[in-house]
Amino acid sequence: MQNKIDYKNIKKIGLVTRPNVSLDKEILKLQSILSIYKVELVLFKESSEILDLPKYGLDDLFKISDFVISLGGDGTLISLCRKACEYDKAVLGIHAGHLGFLTDFKVDEAENFFQAFFQGEFRIEKPYLLSVFLEDKQGKILEKLAFNDVVISKNNQASMAHIEVFRKEKKFNEYFGDGLIVATPAGSTAYNLSANGPIVYTLAQAFILTPVCSHSLTQRPIVLPKGFEIEIMAKDCILCIDGQENYKMNDFKSIKVGLSDKNVALIHPKNRDYFQILKEKLHWGN
């Protein structure tokens, strides 16, 4: 994953918007700002039906863009980050709607950001993703990435999920309850937090196992290091990646999860303060 951006030679910036929402006004404002720096704004083909701007499929958009803007909420950014890993491209999150943990500023603040950006005043953070290996009953392995989390939960018919977790074929825990969250540090402030999991610093090389509504009083979240791969077995459960992709666990012979070697470059304002964000979002202190 790229460690720096050649901000002096940016030619094209891609843009992907929150789905099913018209953001034409915001797109035109970004185009106007970028034109000052002689940068072309190109769109994902589903981002606008009206605007007369170059439009591309997602793969082509990543290929031709120096980096890509996510205009929406955290969900838009999360799905884009998984794609960005395939093309070694950075992502900038601008929020449109509810404020999240991952997007940094609104379109109204974009002029100030890009003025600083094109002077080299920005920072890049590279959080790690989870690798998920799904092996079907014919032995074919499908690898997926998760930016926030992988959630194993009971289906509608099951009264309780029974989830077994192994490392190197040795069982080290089993969970009875509503489910299990496997979260990245970046995802530790999402579903993991609402299930009383710990907040882990975004750039830590670790991941978290957090039980959901455990039927045991002694089950607690655990933080595991990079290089610690787990195998998860559960019948009649659903595996969900980032709240966006669902798989029936009965369809697979083996499911393994661990912190990936892949990370994604996120562009932030230079003055971004992770702990100040936590303080504001979680109402810490005064």
From Swiss-Prot:
**Cofactors, names only:** a divalent metal cation
| EC number(s) reported in the record | 2.7.1.23
Q: Which residues form the active site?
A: 74 (proton acceptor)
What are the record keywords, sorted?
ATP-binding, Cytoplasm, Kinase, NAD, NADP, Nucleotide-binding, Transferase
Keyword check for Electron transport, yes or no.
no
Main location per the UniProt record = cytoplasm
Q: Which residues form a coiled coil?
A: none
Q: Which transformation does this protein catalyse, written as a reaction?
A: NAD(+) + ATP = ADP + NADP(+) + H(+)
Please give the InterPro entries that the UniProt record associates with this protein: ATP-NAD_kinase_N, ATP-NAD_kinase_PpnK-typ_C, NAD/diacylglycerol_kinase_sf, NADK
Localization annotation: Cytoplasm
Which EC class is the enzyme in? transferase
Question: Where is NAD(+) bound in this sequence?
Answer: 74-75, 148-149, 178, 186, 189-194, 244
Which terms in the GO cellular component ontology are assigned? cytoplasm
Instruction: Supply the Gene3D superfamilies for this chain.
Output: Probable inorganic polyphosphate/atp-NAD kinase, domain 1 (3.40.50.10330), Probable inorganic polyphosphate/atp-NAD kinase, domain 2 (2.60.200.30)
Supply one GO BP term.
NADP biosynthetic process
Molecular function (GO) terms for this protein are:
ATP binding; metal ion binding; NAD binding; NAD+ kinase activity
Q: Which family does it belong to?
A: Belongs to the NAD kinase family.
Q: What does this protein do?
A: Involved in the regulation of the intracellular balance of NAD and NADP, and is a key enzyme in the biosynthesis of NADP. Catalyzes specifically the phosphorylation on 2'-hydroxyl of the adenosine moiety of NAD to yield NADP.
> NCBIfam families, alphabetically?
PRK14077.1 (NF010679)
State the name under which the record lists this protein. NAD kinase
Q: Which organism is it from?
A: Campylobacter jejuni subsp. jejuni serotype O:6 (strain 81116 / NCTC 11828)
